[in-house]
Amino acid sequence: MARFFALGPLVLVLCLVLFLSPTSTSEQDTDTKVTGSSNSPTIMQSATPTPALPTGSVKGVKANDSGTTEVPCQYRLIVNGYEKNSLLVNINGSKSQNYTIRIKDKKSEKKIPVSIVSDTTTIDILFEWLKPCTNYSVNIDNCNVVGENHFNLNVLKSVNHSAEPKGDEQVCFKDSKWNLTKCVNITTEDSCVQKPIQINLETCNYTMNVHMPPVKPEITFSESIPTKFVWSNKPLSSDNVTSQCKDTFKVKCTDDTEYDLDKDVFLKPSEEYTCTGKYKYYNTSIDSKSKQVNIHCEWINETVFSEVTSNSIVIFWNLSPGDKCKGITWEKFSAICKKSHDQKCRKVNDTTAECVFSELKSYINYTCTLSAEVNKSIGVFPIYTRDFNQRTNSSNPSFEDHDNVKVKETSHNSFNVNCKNLKPDEWNGPKGIYIAKLLSNRPPVTKENPKSCSFTFENLYYHTEYTIEIIAINGNKNESSAKATHSTRYNDKALIGFLVFLILVTSLALLFVLYKLFLLKRKRTAEDEEILLTQPLRRVEPIYAGGLVEAYKNKIADEGRLFMDEFQSIPRIFSNYTIKEAKKSENQYKNRYVDILPYDYNRVTLSTGGEDNYINASFIEGYREPKKYIAAQGPKDETVVDFWRMVWEQKSSIIVMVTRCEEGNKTKCAQYWPSLDREAEIFEEFVVKIRSEEHCPDYVIRHLILNNKREKGSEREVTHIQFISWPDHGVPGDPSLLLKLRRRVNSFKNFFSGPVVVHCSAGVGRTGTYMSIDAMIESLEAEGRVDIYGFVAKLRRQRCLMVQVEAQYILIHTALIEYNQFGETEVSLSEFHSVLNTLRQKNGSDPSLLEKEFQKLPKFKKWRTMNTGSSEDNKKKNRDSAVIPYDFNRVIFRLDIEGNQTSDPEDEEEYSSDEEEESNQYINASFIDGYWCNKSLIAAQGPLQSTAEEFLLMLYQQQTKTLVMLTDCQEDGKDYCFQYWGDEKKTYGDMEIEVKKTETFPTYVRRHLEIQSLKKKEVLKVDQYQFLKWRGRELPENAQELVEMASIIRENGHYDNSKTNRNVPIVVHCNNGSSRTGIFCALWNLLDSAYTEKLVDVLQEVKNLRKLRQGMVETIEQYQFLYTALEGAFPVQNGAVKTPPAKDAAQVINETTALLTEPNSTSGADQKEAEESTAAESNEQGAKESSTAEAPAAEGDGEKATSEGPTNGPTATVEV
């Protein structure tokens, strides 16, 4: 204790001395920069004076060898501002030596060797390699710290950073100063957003303000030219977040071209592109998924030959890229033909050019190429071409040189004539023949030579001057001629020859006089001898098959004047043929009309003999077949026995009846067959039984058994075919109906059949029309040509007034055109599979027969007016501008019609245009003819929201029971149909709709709907069938699923056996009312035909649909689908086609009222009806009272016309 107090004062004195003594500094400043490794800090060493360390911090003071006191090393830590990037360390040492500075954090330690050359040194340490928000401690070996020896760098924000995407879902940000990295997920909410991200460090959170990338871009494009690329998932700003995507997005395609977004891009059509969107982000890019781009234009590439002559061709070329490629415009059109000299093309409009080829040679098949170049301002596109072959018309042969004919005399009255033979190209048409005519004051002499221009004329008149005319006629009847003269020489034996000639002439004259006397006597004794016509027939050339259409066009032009002239030039009655038997008083009651009587020479004579052998019927020749037909009047009650006697005696097995028993409240024919409920009728010795009766829409087939009680054991089968679709006035508007009737009749013929009995009412008009069509088709098949005029004249020589009115004469022409253009396309179910296999077969690159059949179909583009649907007020009501209903069959409904009643078409025609505008409402829907009756289907587009009320009103007024929907409301993002029903009752204007029940099946949904007008109490119940297997496809994958749904609709709606339901239209709708609707309507009618007749005719069905609405069954794939559906509906089992049983039971038909309400096709509203002649039906009493009076004109079939009032026939729709 005493020692401590003794040393205390000494220690205190030493401390005071150290504290008060000034710090020594060196008088010279030296800076030494020491650079370590890349991971070592940069050290700045300075010998500048530094503040003295507090004495209180000194530890371990000791004396050195010299006896002085040695002060231990001390250091102080000074952290400068971070912007200077340095750390100061003050070291006070007692001598120069090497020090080691240790900087440590929790994980690592850095050693920095430092040399001190003075007692006190300040060291700057740059800390780029240090991390922010991290605690560090600084220690120096063998030195004591003054103050704190730890520090941290609280740097909170980054100044510079980089970014690099990591896959599609992450991006990594790296601080360029501190080498800090953080990866974050890319989300939709953060796309293109400026946001801070934090890195959690030891003492604080380090923040980087970054620009987030977008989620992986997706690009879309419009399928059109020009197209536009769109960044479909581009982030959009919301209420809380502002998206700031940079305008650096480009689309790069395989042609190494970059395109901007939302700008017109002209790509080449039908070329495959691979396009990728690229978003520039920092020093890299973010790519979208590659998109395959291939834009197919719906090219319309049509050529129409507007004029073809013997030396020129004018063609209109319509080259339109379609609605999808409206951006393609043409810069110029051009054309070139082989072997031609001059061709010019004139641009008519943006898509059409008129090309004129002139100075051509006659009858040459030219191969030409049309070219169109796209406007270069929109890009480099290929040149579009269209090749065609066309032959120029024929002209007169090049045979007009007067020096061409050479005459060489061989004797005094003989010579040879030669001329230069024409080369093939000099005929200017098909090779023909040479004709030589010798002209003098005597009868001309004519010779033909089909091989060469060489003729020999012998035994000519002596001393006579002849003009020799050589005519070259090519195969198209064009002719040229050349002439020469030559005189025969005098004969030295002229006298002898003259005497001989005089004797011969005298003898011949005497014989001629005797012959004429004999003929005169014979004429007086035989009054029925045929004499020459006092009115010669007109010379009308036969028509070849290839010229039927052109002939029809020529004759129908100018309101059918040529048809009228031809028809009126044929005598109605050939008065040189007697009609004595028909005019006998005892036979007059047997005639239905007093002026339609059979000629005596070819009337059918019954075997009863005497006065009872008369019947109003005539044998008629067919095409090269005598007595092929019997043309008879419709039997009267008084002549039914005679009719059956004629059938029995002539062994006829087929009766064709082309009328109804009553038409227009007039009796046309007695019912001479038994009805099903009576089974048999007895007409004196004849017993007629009915075995079966088949009802079809246009005809009824009855299978009868005919017995003759006088001939035991005799029984014959007679087929009775009654055509019921001939309208009361005019003629059938569709000639294919008569072709179908002909096929039915011929299907029952056999080798042993007698004459076919054909009758209407008078047995002349409709009867003659049917016979003419049948015979002319045989002529067309045998000779490739028809002589309609000659055959009708021939018919009238056999029975008066055959083919009674001009409309029937025209109908014969249109029926032959129909047959020649389309042929026989009807197929029975028993042969369907074998025929279909044949149709599908292909021979190399040639199209199959099925494809050729489809190509025959007319397109009927704009063949009827569409004024209502195309008006400005109604354009907005159409989904598709290419599918607008025709005016003649559009569905008309009226807002002022109260209640659930359908509009009467006859009443509609009486409306004025003002009334129609005010009352009739427009909806895009068309009436479609069904198999059983007209207007039994309605094809409609999917209703828009703005037309939902009109759609429901149409259903309500048409009393529709069944509604077929073939689309979803939306498909592939496109609106196909507004959903006009809902879970709860919906109201649209005055109409309400409610779903009462929903049934879901694998392929369709059935909804039971109730529709009501707020103005009426009646509720309409409708079954809606929505087909589910058509979504996103051009055709259903399984055709049988559609067939099955149609069968279920037929069964549930009782359409198979209910005439009432057949007349109520079924409404079918898809997006535009044609693309899918047309297939369903065609299939519906074909199935009806198959079930009823065991026959189908796909071509005729599609042709009829195309005439009723645009866009129906437009592609070969849709056409083939119908065949595929029928193939599956009627499969082959055990080698035979499995046909469904006929669901239509035979019905008892009262002929006096049957089918009077059925709609009938007419030849058009603008065609006049044939005027009926002022005739009264004769009866027995009237005949007796007026047997000596002049008979009045006959009352015909409602089809007769007087000579003062001829009518025009039907208008043929011809597309070539």
From Swiss-Prot:
One of its GO terms (molecular function) is protein tyrosine phosphatase activity. The active site is at C760, C1070. One of its GO terms (biological process) is T cell receptor signaling pathway. Its EC number is 3.1.3.48. Residues 1-26 form the signal peptide. GO terms for cellular component: plasma membrane. It is a single-pass type I membrane protein. Substrate binds at D728, C760, S761, A762, G763, V764, G765, R766, Q804. It catalyses: O-phospho-L-tyrosyl-[protein] + H2O = L-tyrosyl-[protein] + phosphate. The modification Phosphoserine is found at S881, S903. Residues 904-919 have a biased composition (Acidic residues). The keyword Chaperone does not apply. It is found in: Cell membrane. Residues 26-49, 1154-1165, 1204-1216 have a biased composition (Polar residues). CDD domains: FN3 (cd00063), R-PTP-C-2 (cd14558), R-PTPc-C-1 (cd14557). InterPro entries: FN3_dom, FN3_sf, Ig-like_fold, Prot-tyrosine_phosphatase-like, Protein-Tyr_Phosphatase, PTP_cat, Ptprc, Tyr_Pase_AS. Glycans are attached at residues 64, 92, 98, 135, 160, 179, 185, 205, 240, 283, 301, 349, 365, 375, 393, 478. Residues 26-67, 899-919, 1154-1216 are annotated as: Disordered. Residues 563-819, 850-1129 form the Tyrosine-protein phosphatase domain. Pfam families: Y_phosphatase. It comes from the Eukaryota. Belongs to the protein-tyrosine phosphatase family. Receptor class 1/6 subfamily. PANTHER family: RECEPTOR-TYPE TYROSINE-PROTEIN PHOSPHATASE (PTHR19134), RECEPTOR-TYPE TYROSINE-PROTEIN PHOSPHATASE C (PTHR19134:SF539). Protein tyrosine-protein phosphatase required for T-cell activation through the antigen receptor. This is Receptor-type tyrosine-protein phosphatase C. It comes from Cyprinus carpio.
